[in-house]
Amino acid sequence: KEGYLVDYHTGCKYTCAKLGDNDYCVRECRLRYYQSAHGYCYAFACWCTHLYEQAVVWPLPNKRCKGK
């Protein structure tokens, strides 16, 4: 599974500035999911890959990001 890393409290994606390979996105994807996950910056948000099938990614059901 893959998808955008999401903040559970706000419903917003984790933003990033450096497109492509991005240490911040790799670190955040691994912290949220597990060490074999990978991440990169796609469309200015962290995209995580190699996730388990039940991983929660953006968009969250019944939770909209306000103002972003």
From Swiss-Prot:
Gene Ontology, cellular component aspect: extracellular region
A molecular function (GO) term: toxin activity
Free-text note on domains in this protein's UniProt record: Has the structural arrangement of an alpha-helix connected to antiparallel beta-sheets by disulfide bonds (CS-alpha/beta).
Alphabetical keyword list: Amidation, Disulfide bond, Ion channel impairing toxin, Neurotoxin, Secreted, Toxin, Voltage-gated sodium channel impairing toxin
Protein name per its UniProtKB record: Beta-toxin Cl13
Modified residues (Lysine amide): K66
Disulfide bonds: C12-C65, C16-C41, C25-C46, C29-C48
Tissue and organ distribution: Expressed by the venom gland.
Job of this protein: Beta toxins bind voltage-independently at site-4 of sodium channels (Nav) and shift the voltage of activation toward more negative potentials thereby affecting sodium channel activation and promoting spontaneous and repetitive firing. Inhibits sodium channels Nav1.4/SCN4A, Nav1.5/SCN5A and Nav1.6/SCN8A. Also has a weak inhibitory effect on Nav1.2/SCN2A. Is lethal to mice.
Pfam families: Toxin_3
Residues covered by the LCN-type CS-alpha/beta domain: 1-66
Compartments where found: Secreted
Misc note: Negative results: has no inhibitory effect on Nav1.1/SCN1A, Nav1.3/SCN3A and Nav1.7/SCN9A.
Gene Ontology biological-process annotations: defense response
Family in the record: Belongs to the long (4 C-C) scorpion toxin superfamily. Sodium channel inhibitor family. Beta subfamily.
Gene3D superfamilies per record: Knottin, scorpion toxin-like (3.30.30.10)
Secretion signal, residue range per the UniProt entry: none
